[in-house]
Structure formats: C-alpha cells, structure tokens
C-alpha cells in the first residue's frame, strides 16, 4: 500500500474539494487513461486494488502508471469513545481527487485490452470515471 515515508505533521484538516483539477488532468506517460468525473477521497487500498486488477488483466504486456498518491492522513477515533480529549489517531491514507484528474495511465497494449483492464480498475473506484485516449 502507498503511503508517505515521512510527513511534516501527523494530522491534517479534512479540507474541501471545490472546483476541478487543473494539475494532472492530461495524459503524460501512456496512451490510455482513467479520468475521474467526481470529487472524492481515494484510499491507498482502493488505488492498490485498481493497480492490481489492471496488472493482472494486462499480464506481461504493457506498462501502467499510477498518477495519484495518498498523501493525506485520515484520523479515526476509537469506537464507543466520548467526545473531546483530542483528535483521533491517523488510521489510513487518502488521495484527494477532483474531477478531471487522471488516476491511471496505460501504454504498450491494444485499445481493447486497455479498455477492458481500465474498466476493471474503474469498478474498484468509489467514483464515476471515464476512459480516455491520448491524441
């Protein structure tokens, strides 16, 4: 699972996901890509599940690039704990994804293989996505 090696601070504010993604919204490495259409937090487990699904389907052919990285810690309080006494401890990592962001890229395979592999990965995501091809 992906997570930062070290961070400056252990805990972060939740923040807001306003607007669309201006960075990371173009295909850079491969020929085919999976693009987010909704804003959401995507956990490191979901990213890894999508990557594994694509890798299994493509077998040895092709190359896969993961364009998002989970750099935001999400804190969770223990169950049946009263309010107060500070913020919970960091439990897992998420990537903040806005509409338009490229999640995965793929190259070195035919369009049919890429479309099938990316659609399997799209099923692992908690948001609506679309398959796009580089010009």
UniProtKB/Swiss-Prot annotation:
One GO process term, biological-process aspect: mitochondrial translation
One term of GO molecular function: structural constituent of ribosome
Quaternary organization: Part of the 50S ribosomal subunit.
Protein name: Large ribosomal subunit protein uL16c
NCBIfam families per the UniProt record, alphabetical: rplP_bact
Location of the protein in the cell: Plastid, Chloroplast
Pfam assignment, any one: Ribosomal_L16
Family: Belongs to the universal ribosomal protein uL16 family.
GO cellular component: chloroplast; mitochondrial large ribosomal subunit
Cell inner membrane found in the keyword field: no
Record has Cytoplasm as a keyword: no
Primary subcellular site in the record, as a coarse category: plastid
Keywords: Chloroplast, Plastid, Ribonucleoprotein, Ribosomal protein
């Amino acid at each position: 699972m992906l997570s930062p090696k070290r961070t400056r601070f252990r805990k972060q504010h939740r923040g807001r996901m306003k607007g669309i993604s201006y960075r990371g919204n173009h295909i850079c490495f491969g020929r085919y890509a999976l693009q987010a259409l909704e804003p959401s937090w995507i956990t490191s487990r979901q990213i890894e599940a999508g990557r594994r699904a694509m890798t299994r389907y493509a077998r040895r052919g092709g190359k896969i690039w993961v364009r998002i990285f989970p750099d935001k810690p999400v804190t969770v309080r223990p169950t049946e704990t009263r309010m107060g006494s500070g913020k919970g401890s960091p439990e897992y990592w998420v990537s903040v994804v806005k509409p338009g962001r490229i999640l995965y890229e793929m190259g070195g395979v035919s369009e049919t293989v890429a479309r099938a592999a990316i659609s399997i990965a799209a099923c692992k995501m908690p948001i609506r996505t679309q398959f796009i091809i580089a010009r």
